[in-house]
Amino acid sequence: MSKAYEQSGVNIHAGYEAVERMSSHVKRTMRKEVIGGLGGFGATFDLSQLNMTAPVLVSGTDGVGTKLKLAIDYGKHDSIGIDAVAMCVNDILTTGAEPLYFLDYIATNKVVPEVIEQIVKGISDACVETNTALIGGETAEMGEMYHEGEYDVAGFAVGAVEKDDYVDGSEVKEGQVVIGLASSGIHSNGYSLVRKLINESGIDLASNFDNRPFIDVFLEPTKLYVKPVLALKKEVSIKAMNHITGGGFYENIPRALPAGYAARIDTTSFPTPKIFDWLQQQGNIDTNEMYNIFNMGIGYTVIVDEKDASRALKILAEQNVEAYQIGHIVKNESTAIELLGV
């Protein structure tokens, strides 16, 4: 075989090895609706087996952002795969959709099979937890596009929901309750600022913070909310949901509210992880701005009728999710979110 391609910076054999290494991880994620296996030009999924009357497909795509830089610098690659899945499936979950399948895209300076395997293992772990088939993907070696050791990861998720069960916020009314589901930490947003503060502080990321190495705190993967929220949806009528990502409370909570309504949030009603206090102090950041950047301890919200709030909290507790009644819906023509206690 000609070495011309390899001399241009593309190692075909490393790509083959990466595929071989990832195959066992991918197989763990398969669902009965998946038709065929890996290696085809297009991945296929049989919707007729879902037993839905009028399925609506919901799709989403996202990446992990500059959190990748920390993972690359410290050689911790598996948790990044979890982040890639979580950012996508949590987004489509806000419509009430059950995630069905996921595709990944990994672009890198040079294919290192061991690193690709770690990333795909994390992706597969998250797919197994959320019953999402890893149905396809692409690994691209682009030496001229990335510095040595660098890579980027993006994901694409597709789910389905019965048309009559689609959650779009149109039933939000005054007096309904906002329930917040605890985050696992910073999740995958705000890392350009996080990395800046890390560099300015000069901290040793191997040193401990709150009984854990700093690096483990910063790379804690985004929490997956699929199982608990779908369990809740079976028992309680959910009026709206939000995934608290980039833009924090201020940008994300209003996205599911009809015009003329606001979520009045009591910021003293839930605990804020200590890492946010560290970031705020290190950067001398205004509290309002913190809520405009980070999740501040709440990674996902659901809005339910007041009569269903206690039951919803009980169901979430049974799903081993920390959840809090953090606010309620009010009429407000001028703003869609009111934060109390900041």
From Swiss-Prot:
Molecular function terms from GO: ATP binding; phosphoribosylamine-glycine ligase activity; phosphoribosylformylglycinamidine cyclo-ligase activity
Protein's cellular compartments: Cytoplasm
A matching Pfam family: AIRS
Enzyme class: ligase
CDD domains: PurM
Keywords in alphabetical order: ATP-binding, Cytoplasm, Ligase, Nucleotide-binding, Purine biosynthesis
Species classification: Bacteria, Bacillati, Bacillota, Bacilli, Bacillales
UniProt pathway: Purine metabolism; IMP biosynthesis via de novo pathway; 5-amino-1-(5-phospho-D-ribosyl)imidazole from N(2)-formyl-N(1)-(5-phospho-D-ribosyl)glycinamide: step 2/2
Homology family: Belongs to the AIR synthase family.
GO biological process terms held by the UniProt record: 'de novo' IMP biosynthetic process; adenine biosynthetic process
Organism: Staphylococcus aureus (strain JH9)
Name this polypeptide is given: Phosphoribosylformylglycinamidine cyclo-ligase
